Amino acid sequence: MKIKKRQYLIIPAMGFIFVGAMACSPATDQFSARSAAKGIPAGWSTGGLGMAGVDYDWIARFKDPQLMALVAEAMKRNPDLKATAERVRRAEAVARLSGAEKKPQLNAQVNSLQQKQRFPGFPIKLGSNNAEAYGASLDVNWEPDLWGRLRASQAAAAAESMAFAEDYRSARASLAGQLAKAWFALGEAAEQVILAEAAVGVRVKTVASVQERFAAALEGGLASQLRLAETDLASSRASLALWESERARAIRQLELLIGRFPEGNIPEPHRLPGAPSVPPAGLPSELLKRRPDIIAAERRYEAAGLRRGAARAARYPSFSLTGRSGTSTSAFEDVLDRGFGIWSLAGSVAQPLFAGGRLKEEERIAGHDEVIALQELQGTILRAFAEVEQALVAEEFYARREAAVLESATSARKAAEASILDFADGAVDALTLLAAQDRQVQTAFQLVSLRRMRLENRINLHLALGGDFQTQVLP
């Protein structure tokens, strides 16, 4: 009877320990980018450029069906993006695996034992003793999560999984941005090739005109002017070769980003599109909820804090329950007979006493990891704000520069056209003609490059704002 009384005392005591331990389980801290960010301004420094709203489907803003088709193809074929998607799936599997540790473990077991024992050394021959034993059982093992260690580990794995999902969003946006920039670089090269071909044609005619006047000895000192005209022609041919090379390079860069074999088989755009309207920038505080890199850093900060809690809980006592139910018999045919049934139930409490300082240092390391994650989150937030501010300010300057260069290019074109007529009439010398033509060529090249740079800055602004676009399914 004493044994029974002790059993009745042990069970309530373990229940008391379990309930008390659950009450002592540490609460999980809330980790957010807003709490990590310091001194978020009420608005952007550019004022009017930062309109309210959300930047949806920024690829469609360029109104280029071919670009949209290439982006959609890249989302399906790019191997780097596929690898990032697999990392997301792997992180999700790790999170599910971490959750499995909280559940009871059930194992089926079948055993067989055959034993033979001899009795040597006796005055009479006793022979030997043969014994057989068979059994089947179901074993259950469960470790109740007294201090929240397993719960914190599972939550940390889930937060890490969400961070990888945001990494995928970030990689997806980055790929779209790189592809759009490569597409516009191809558009610039195509336009520059056309301009270079036109410049070669014009300068061939100029060389012929100067050569004609030189042969007729209409002016003194035309030999040097003829050489200058020939120099400009050679320079234009070099520019043409350069831009043809840039066009081929841009095509292969596009194919690489898409995931195609780089064979130079992409139809090039006829010209660069105009810059669309400035996207809505919203409020700086809203950026914390849109940028995938900020959200990923936020989730990693959360995971680090949860792992710190799990490391702290690992220093507390652990409680485990084991149970077995089955049969044990000397005859194999009786293995499934309940009349030979056995069962057992055991509980244990273990308190780490000495581990060479390992548990303490693991908690310290987890604390350092949490501080590192916080600093990385704050750095990500600052970089995000800087990228938006820089893109908004650059947009203002690019708009002013494009207007000024457009005016300059228009004036240079008119001056070159007038100088051709004046040169034919003998009103100006070849130097004036060559200078006017060179100014026209250079301003035309500059205008195309500036338009491409403005489009690239617009892409940077879309990415900095955490803008989204279509075709969001994992490849």
Spans of model-derived segments:
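Terminal intrinsically disordered/low-complexity segments used for targeting and assembly
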Residues: 1-76, 134, 158, 241-289, ...
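Glycine-focused motif/segment detector
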Residues: 217-219, 426
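Alpha-solenoid helical repeat architecture
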Residues: 221-225
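Hydrophobic membrane-targeting signal helices
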Residues: 18-23, 202, 349-350
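Amphipathic alpha-helical coiled-coil segments
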Residues: 83-98, 171, 175-198, 202-207, ...
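Small/polar-residue-enriched beta-strand and adjacent coil segments characteristic
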Residues: 57, 65, 70, 101-170, ...
